């Protein structure tokens, strides 16, 4: 049961003052933040949080994907990159700070239909890798054989390889060849000859376009979209994506209808 620390509810979305219990820089300008609160019990792999910047001049909340979830300790791990003034403020917050958090938001990845003996492919790129960690962990717990291919610009940018390697077979690519396989995730995936029961991906638009094309007709292939947001509740339509099949509706909202969509459903 959620206590009074969750001040408001908007449908399934809650507002809570969560506590910052740990933070560290894990790569240049990329930080790992651990928050504690009762909201954690409601979180699913692939969802995100909308966090208020503790600065009166910053009006919009920042959407940050949930990387790992630990209901037992009521903590969640977020990984974010400093992109501007708001995220720079996050990186300087002292341990014990309280943050106004709205969430958990988004539909997340549906992992309930996979189990023992099945295979899943996880594809991530750059700062799109973090939300896939909990996906890999949960699939592993369900007995799924997990193959992970993640791509980064260079060796210094590689993150979360150790965490993923604990639950999956991991292949890392770098654009410049300074670590792992030289090239892109497509370099590795195009050489694979095995079939997968499900595909989960998150990353830059170019990578997601590749995944959408290659697995366009796969019945269980999913892409998680990154988008700029304003309200985070679907009211402002600032994060709209367009549908391939417009017979019913022309668009969907990343914050409310996503961020996870099936391949072959949206225009990339």
What are these model-derived regions, one by one?
Residues 5-97:
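Ferredoxin-reductase
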Residues 185, 251, 262-268:
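A charged, well-structured terminal subsegment
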Residues 22, 68, 172-174, 223-225, ...:
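Structural signal for conserved beta-strand scaffold positions within catalytic alpha/beta enzyme cores
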Residues 85-228:
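FNR/FR-type flavoprotein reductase catalytic core
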Residues 54-58, 103-108, 245:
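Short, charged beta-turn/beta-strand-edge "cap" motif at the junction between a beta-strand
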Residues 205-206, 226-260:
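Local cysteine-cluster metal-coordination motifs and their immediate loop/turn environment
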């Amino acid at each position: 049961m959620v206590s009074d620390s969750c001040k408001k509810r908007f449908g399934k979305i809650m507002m809570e003052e969560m506590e910052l219990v740990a933070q560290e820089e894990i790569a240049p300008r990329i930080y790992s933040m651990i928050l504690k609160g009762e909201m954690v019990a409601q979180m699913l792999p692939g969802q995100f949080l909308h966090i208020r910047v503790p600065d009166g001049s910053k009006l919009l909340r920042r959407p940050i994907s949930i990387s790992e979830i630990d209901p037992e300790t009521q903590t969640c791990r977020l990984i974010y990159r400093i992109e501007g003034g708001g995220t720079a403020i996050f990186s300087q917050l002292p341990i014990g700070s309280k943050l106004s958090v709205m969430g958990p938001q988004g539909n997340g990845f549906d992992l309930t239909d996979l189990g023992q003996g099945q295979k899943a492919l996880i594809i991530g790129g750059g700062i799109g890798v973090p939300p896939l960690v909990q996906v890999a962990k949960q699939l592993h717990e369900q007995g799924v054989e997990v193959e992970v291919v993640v791509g980064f610009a260079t060796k210094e940018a590689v993150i979360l390889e150790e965490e993923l390697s604990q639950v999956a077979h991991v292949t890392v690519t770098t654009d410049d060849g300074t670590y792992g396989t030289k090239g892109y995730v497509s370099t590795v995936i195009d050489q694979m000859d095995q079939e997968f029961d499900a595909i989960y991906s998150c990353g830059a638009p170019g990578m997601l376009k590749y995944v959408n094309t290659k697995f366009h007709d796969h019945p269980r292939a999913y892409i998680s979209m990154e988008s700029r947001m304003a309200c985070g509740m679907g009211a402002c339509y600032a994060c709209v994506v367009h549908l391939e099949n417009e017979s019913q509706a022309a668009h969907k909202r990343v914050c409310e209808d996503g961020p996870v969509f099936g391949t072959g459903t949206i225009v990339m």
